[in-house]
From Swiss-Prot:
Family matches, as HAMAP family: PdxS
Disulfide-linked positions: none
E.C. number: 4.3.3.6
Functional pathway: Cofactor biosynthesis; pyridoxal 5'-phosphate biosynthesis
Active site per the UniProt annotation: K85
Binding residues annotated for D-ribose 5-phosphate, in chain numbering: D28, G157, G224, G245, S246
Catalytic activity: aldehydo-D-ribose 5-phosphate + D-glyceraldehyde 3-phosphate + L-glutamine = pyridoxal 5'-phosphate + L-glutamate + phosphate + 3 H2O + H(+)
Domain of life where this protein originates: Eukaryota
Keyword list, A-Z: Lyase, Pyridoxal phosphate, Schiff base
Protein name stated in the entry: Pyridoxal 5'-phosphate synthase subunit pyroA
One example GO MF annotation: pyridoxal 5'-phosphate synthase (glutamine hydrolysing) activity
Length: 304
């Protein structure tokens, strides 16, 4: 990786912290009560924010980092890790989040971007970062900046999983192509370097992904996951875990749905368990059909 030895060592620690969330569900919460519900349901971590993506989308305006006092209240309410969101490129929001002691920082396209040229240089922070991606190029660029965890961008706040599926399938297909290049030639470097240029991704990270057959860091699903079936679908597509935003606390029975999604991620290969946990959950969030959305209303296109 393009970093000093110290930064590389720090990155190994941060990537290890992200690995600890593997196989888990991370839930958006807006207050201490929701955070406790998430913890009781078996969430691996919570994402503290003032408005879930569905409300950010509905209310409009500039979406910024949440009030630190609200984040601290959630941190005091639970024993599981707490994440919080900062705007793309807003390294001072990240400094504040690190100063109050959040466990992970999400440089998130759900908030209004603060910089149209640069993402945060995440190697400068001790806290591990999670970032979204739509494809392998975006994922590897974020990892090169220091992201210890990747998630699909999906289309947050819609309850429509189609974009998350597309982003995961795109990453999988692009890794498969890199792996095919690596395995089909006695000297794959020239072709792999050409593919890295095409993806606008660092060659060393592309080669690592090709060798491993997966991203070098954990890769979670996010954006539109609303049901246990959605969560299991993303796990079967190769995700390491799931973020659920508006899908839990915008549904009919939040406690029951939260537990069901945790169970679905744990037993994602068992249709009988999935059928059982999908019963009697009340109404799922009504949501928005992504195919009816205008391009300018899509959050996933934020970032580059």
């Amino acid at each position: 990786m393009a970093a000093t030895n110290g930064a590389s060592n720090d990155f190994t620690v941060k990537a290890g912290l992200a690995q600890m969330l593997k196989g888990g569900v991370i839930m958006d919460v807006v207050n201490a009560e929701q955070a406790r519900i998430a913890e009781e349901a078996g969430a691996a971590a919570v994402m503290a924010l003032e408005r879930v993506p569905a409300d950010i989308r509905a209310q409009g305006g500039v979406a910024r980092m949440s009030d630190p006092s609200m984040i601290k209240e959630i941190m005091e309410a639970v024993t599981i890790p707490v994440m919080a969101k900062a705007r793309i490129g807003h390294f001072v929001e990240c400094q504040i989040l690190e100063a109050i002691g959040v466990d992970y920082i999400d440089e998130s396209e759900v908030l209004t971007p603060a910089d149209n040229l640069y993402h945060v240089t995440k190697h400068n922070f001790k806290a591990p970062f999670v970032c979204g991606c739509r494809n392998l190029g975006e994922a590897l660029r974020r990892i090169s900046e220091g992201a210890a965890m990747i998630r699909t961008k999906g289309e947050a706040g819609t309850g429509d999983v189609v974009e998350a599926v597309k982003h995961m399938r795109t990453v999988n297909a692009e890794i498969a192509r890199a792996r095919a290049i690596l395995q089909s030639s006695p000297d794959p470097e020239p072709e792999l370097r050409a593919y890295a240029r095409e993806l606008e991704a660092p060659y060393e990270l592309l080669r690592e992904a090709a060798e491993k057959g997966r991203l070098p860091v954990v890769n979670f699903a996010a954006g539109g996951v609303a049901t246990p079936a959605d969560a299991a679908l993303m796990m079967q597509l190769g995700c390491d875990g799931v973020f659920v935003g508006s899908g839990i606390f915008k549904s009919g029975d939040a406690k029951k749905r939260a537990k069901a999604i945790v169970q679905a991620v744990t037993h994602y290969k068992d249709p009988k368990v999935l059928a059982e946990v999908s019963q009697g959950l009340g109404e799922a969030m009504v949501g928005i059909n992504v195919s009816h959305m205008k391009d300018e209303d899509k959050l996933a296109k934020r970032g580059w």
